[in-house]
Amino acid sequence: EKIASYTLKEVCHKADILMVCVKPKDMYDLCSEMKTHIGKELKIVSVAAGITLENLKDALSGGKVYRAMPNIGAKHNLGITSIFSHEELNEILDIFNYLGKAIVVEDEDKINLHTSLIGSAPAFYFEIINEFEHRLNELLPDNVSKRDITLLFLTSLISAIQNGENLEDLIESIKSKGGTTEAGLNHLYENDFINIFSEAIDAAKNRAAELSMD
């Protein structure tokens, strides 16, 4: 089966909506290549963290510009995407709602918070699961795989979502006074786990703000 390929000029001329999915460090070079090929009606959606709508408009010199911050769940149509623009949003919302759920951000400054919560947070979860896997692999039999451990987390989350239960209530339903779960949780609380996790979110948010000033 043949796969069509297009030059950047052809893409800009043929597309109604153009998704620009590059890292922030590569965005301005790409905009420089694109700007001479952009018509005023082309809708351009950037997923680069930290690059403001104003900076995108200046770099592109044309088109209707949107910012979107999806997360990894979009690969499975389970993503959450925050969107900001001064343009009409219906078509863009339709695309990202197909990939999960789209959230309109009214204040562009808040998209930095959405970046840290929506875009970066899955990596924080993965790191916790990864460390959990390493420790359990030291303690459990060889026939317990990483996949089994990941499924442990996944089934717990599915249960919470399907039953609409409060996470605090789920924690209470698992732990018992003086038991193993309470001992582990107390160790987390005593070692400032909550603040460390909160500070990680703040660090991601602050970095997104720094990128917007570059």
How should each PLM-predicted stretch be described?
Residues 1, 5-83:
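Rossmann-like NAD(P)(H) cofactor-binding subdomain of soluble oxidoreductases
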Residues 6, 55-64, 80-113, 123-163, ...:
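Internal alpha-helical scaffold of NAD(P)-dependent oxidoreductase catalytic cores
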Residues 9, 24, 49-50, 108, ...:
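Alpha-helix N-cap/helix-start capping motif
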Residues 15, 27, 31, 53, ...:
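A general structural signal for well-ordered alpha-helical segments in protein cores
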Residues 70-74, 115-125:
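Glycine/serine-rich anion-binding loops at beta->alpha junctions
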Residues 75-79, 112-115, 183:
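A short acidic, helix-capping loop that chelates divalent metal ions and anchors anionic groups
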Residues 148-214:
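NAD(P)-dependent Rossmann-like dehydrogenase/reductase catalytic/cofactor-binding core
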